[in-house]
Amino acid sequence: MCGICGFVGNGNKSILINMREKMLHRGPDDAGIYLNLENQIGLGHRRLSIIDLSERGRQPMESSSGENVITYNGEVYNYLEIKRELEKNGIYFRSNTDTEVVLEAIQYWGIKAINKFHGMFAIAIWNKSKKELLLIRDRLGIKPLYYSITQSGIVFASEIKALLEHPEVPKDLNYNALDCYLKVDYIPGNRTIFKYVHKLLPAHYLTYKQGDININKYWNLRFTKEKRSVTSWMDELEDEILSSVKARMIADVPIGAFLSGGIDSTIILTAMARISKEPVKTFTIGFTDDMYDESQYAKFVAERNNTKSYYKIIEPQIDFDLLKRLIYQADEPLADGSLMPTYLVCKASKDYAKVILSGDGGDETFLGYEKYERFLNYELSRKKLKIPSSTRFYEIIKKLPIAKRSIMLRYLNDSSYRYAELTYGYFSKSYTDIYGDGLNFKTYQNDKESLDWLVLDEHKSGSSALNTAQMVDYQSYLPDDILMKVDKMSMVNSLEVRVPLLEHRIQELAARLPDSLKLRQGVSKFILKELLKRWDYPEDFIYRRKKGFAPSNRFWFTSENKKIIIDDILNGQAVKEKIFSKKYLTKRINKKDYNTVWRVW
């Protein structure tokens, strides 16, 4: 795992090094640059050494032909298989790194090589002869990649703070993104909090050549249903999980696992224990409040698998200086209650392991959240009540303003819009009153741009309501909240976190599963729980009520914390500059609207 950055256009060595050094935490083991001012190209790299710790793995790295140069963040787990295929075709390798395999694969097969990669990655390759920059992000968005189109070219980096070191990248705020954040607690889609900084979306690649930019999608998750026995599905899923975990245990440094005691982390740890010849190191965060604490279940799983276990219990006392530093590390506003616990479990792990396996992605893949059942019940109720489509309401709808008319039509006809409303109150919430006189702001909630993360037409054929909900989360919540949080909080600790359940073959298998094998009569993640039964876990452990890793915002609102938070908000710079309305915020505080208060703080 590493930090990458670069530019095409105006720039120099000092700018490139400043960008690179903003990501020292992502790669404290080594650093390098490639700079050709004649062609106006600079690539930077900060290295966290995981595979082949020698200098032969130093980046940026040139291909054997000298035509391509790569700076790369991530891991391609099947690199040895690809390497053997390339060697049969006469390619000679100078190192044992997956970086060189990625570089030579793209040199040999072109962009189609991406389809061979199993893993997580953010890749930048400069082609010297074509004078073309290629940026690639992995299928699920596990690794971040940001870019900005500038006056003279393009700038990119693993983190926004590095991007902003380039003098041609403006720091203007994106008020559209701010409005989205206040509704969903994170910033969805390709936007960021900075108007001229964009995310390269998951499963996309970008080419930049002499001012022309093209962005293409190289992978889609298609939901198709197959009729097979539960045993047949479980056999295939078990094989894929064991294979994915085994591939992610390859490293030249110590490895371990996060263990919450939930279904997903239990699946991952049990698979690791079956594969490993040594006791697996596990790391667990607990809470003093039993409402959120699952450490007793983590201890049960750890003892059952004979692990070497480490525990940390969190008090509901906020280290405000630390939390402000974490928001800086996150690059953008993020009102996720598990931000600090994620940082703390990463910090507790880094002295004992350099690579960690995590169960992230299980809830989105196998319908683990309660919101999926709520949405299913809502959609079933609509059918029972025979709520008509937009055609029946057209005479009323056509009298609405154009922007509201468009949203109402989509709401009636598009289940992704209904899911966004049921989950976030996206269309009924209005934060117009929160903004102060110092901000010339118009709300963008009706703007087409602010809803691009809900456009799912390409996935609709044959999809169920639950599939639609999953796709919304795959396009937004998973990459823009969960995976962004894990990446930033792990990398600030110079720790690589791998997510076996987000192996794309597991995703494609899960997309073929009947909904009833994910959510069955109120039982979420049904097939994963059946797999744990196969692995001899007791039913009272498997079917207990889910608590989740993130405490609610109320957990942090102790009397002492609340006083500091309220003082920060009402006397903070944003209120003084009249960006936010003090009157509105005071009203929300008096109503104990902790969610809004937390978002704003």
Please give the residue ranges for each predicted region:
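Cysteine-centered catalytic environments shared across enzyme families
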Residues: M1-A330, T342, C346, R534, ...
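Acceptor-substrate binding/catalytic loop of class I
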Residues: L334-D336
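Short low-complexity, flexible loop/linker segments enriched in glycine and/or proline
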Residues: K324-Y328, K350, Y372-R374, W556-F557
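Adenosyl-5′-phosphate
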Residues: M1-I4, N18, E165, V197-P202, ...
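Phosphate/oxyanion-binding loops and surfaces in catalytic or ligand/nucleic-acid-binding neighborhoods
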Residues: R26, Y79, I142, L163-H166, ...
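Active-site adenylate/phosphate-handling loop in enzymes that bind or generate adenylated species
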Residues: R139, Y343-K404, Y477, I482, ...
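Residues that scaffold the ATP/ADP-binding catalytic core of kinase and kinase-like folds
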Residues: E85, H166, T365-G368, L509
